[in-house]
């Protein structure tokens, strides 16, 4: 086992792409929400004097794990995920449920390279600003990516998927995908979970 200085575990080198507090250092907190079924990984982000947690939800699915709302994959975040993987199986699915939210889109390219066998599902209508670029230019591997609803939905035996929107914003659109997890009777909307 390699011992790494504590600050390096929280380091996120891509922070200039989305320069929000705490910039290059992202502490990750793992919480078990429903024993052996649902977890959250949280990091802080902020602007000026307001800092809020952002959440990636991890849900146990058939033979593995599904990640909703990707976060920047610091070593600390990956170490926490590896603990879950050792018990519950590999990351099978990564969901980006927002068309416009940068806070989750920014971590997806690096996370998809780490879990390079996971299927990626995207909210329809992905866009970037100031120039609307193709997914591959944003670092999102198009060969492993599928569009929610247009190409089906993942894990249909365990989830009911719904769309909030779309709403035209002019530059792009606002749309969020939510899901209801049948086994735990939980509703996952944005970064919120209703139990």
Region spans (language model):
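Long, non-catalytic terminal segments
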Residues: 2-43
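Short, flexible loop segments at the rims of nucleotide/cofactor-binding pockets, characterized by
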Residues: 16-19, 44-48, 67-73, 96-97, ...
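Conserved beta-strand hairpin/beta-sheet module of binuclear metal-dependent hydrolase folds
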Residues: 28-79, 175-181, 186-191
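Active-site metal-binding motif and surrounding structural segment of the metallo-beta-lactamase
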Residues: 74-120
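Generic beta-strand structural signal
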Residues: 91-93, 116-119, 157-159, 175-177, ...
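Metallo-beta-lactamase
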Residues: 125-176
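Conserved small/polar residues in nucleotide/adenosyl-binding loops
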Residues: 193-195
């Amino acid at each position: 086992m390699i011992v790494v200085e504590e600050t390096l575990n929280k380091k996120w080198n891509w922070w200039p792409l989305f320069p929000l507090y705490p910039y290059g250092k992202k502490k990750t907190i793992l919480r078990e929400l429903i024993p052996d079924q649902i977890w959250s990984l949280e990091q802080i982000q902020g602007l000026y004097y307001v800092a809020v947690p952002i959440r990636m939800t991890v849900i146990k699915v058939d033979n593995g794990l599904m990640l909703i709302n990707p976060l920047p994959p610091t070593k600390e975040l990956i170490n926490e995920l590896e603990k879950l993987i050792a018990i519950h199986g590999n990351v099978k699915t990564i969901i980006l449920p927002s068309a416009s939210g940068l806070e989750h889109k920014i971590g997806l390219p690096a996370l998809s390279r780490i879990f390079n066998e996971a299927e990626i599902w995207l909210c329809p209508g992905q866009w970037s600003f100031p120039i609307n670029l193709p997914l591959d230019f944003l670092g999102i591997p198009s060969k492993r990516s599928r569009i929610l609803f247009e190409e089906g939905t993942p894990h249909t035996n365990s989830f009911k998927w719904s769309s909030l929107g779309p709403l035209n914003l002019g530059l792009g659109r606002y749309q969020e995908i939510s899901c209801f997890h049948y086994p735990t009777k939980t509703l996952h909307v944005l970064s919120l979970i209703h139990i």
